[in-house]
């Protein structure tokens, strides 16, 4: 399995504070069956530059790989970022923020409000050869309230990711299952930050998908993560536009 969204690199953001925590998170990922990991530390262009971020990220990665020597775990890693949305994003060297040598960019939106110019920015990114992957769509109230927003972004060429832990919350899981059936969710990841407050729960999330939507759907979403990691086109489900009927999205 592949984890495309995590905060495991030590001391770079609000994730793992040191290599000991990083190693514990990797151990749990390995036990869950994860073998491919994209390290997606937070990047905000209002707080740092791409150059400063990538230098800090590389230093943290080298620190972690040194600590991994002799450990009974083998992974394939890529360096990426969880990039906070801004209308001027396309003016940056966004290729350096993609997941390794892939064209995929993990993009985070504000949770408090829907930002302006999303469609335009998604289009501009794709004109640059970059494929946006929208992070943890379950965390945006405006998307949960109006799934046609996400439909428009996906129809325009973006992909969407959900956190495995969200599938363990019954009410939220019910909504996300609808999103998956509409073809609006493509990959599952952990967004892990720490062993206690936000541990990796990939195996539990996949088991929940199998239970509620069947093994075929769960396998497709897992396979999508593997394909994205290797810069391949995803096996996207047929897209269905959500419609409101008697006050409910169907």
Show which residues each predicted segment covers.
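An N-terminally biased module of ancient metal coordination in phosphate/nucleic-acid-related enzymes
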Residues: 1-74
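Active-site beta-loop-alpha junctions enriched in small/polar residues
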Residues: 7-9, 42, 80-84, 110-112, ...
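Non-catalytic positions within long, well-ordered alpha-helices that form the structural scaffold/packing
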Residues: 30, 126, 180-181
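Extended substrate/RNA-proximal surfaces in nucleic-acid metabolism proteins
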Residues: 48-161, 236-250
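Short acidic, glycine/proline-enriched helix-loop-strand junctions
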Residues: 48-57, 64-65, 71-76, 197-224
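Short acidic/histidine-rich active-site segments
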Residues: 184-200
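Mid-to-C-terminal alpha-helical segments outside catalytic/metal-binding sites
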Residues: 206-250
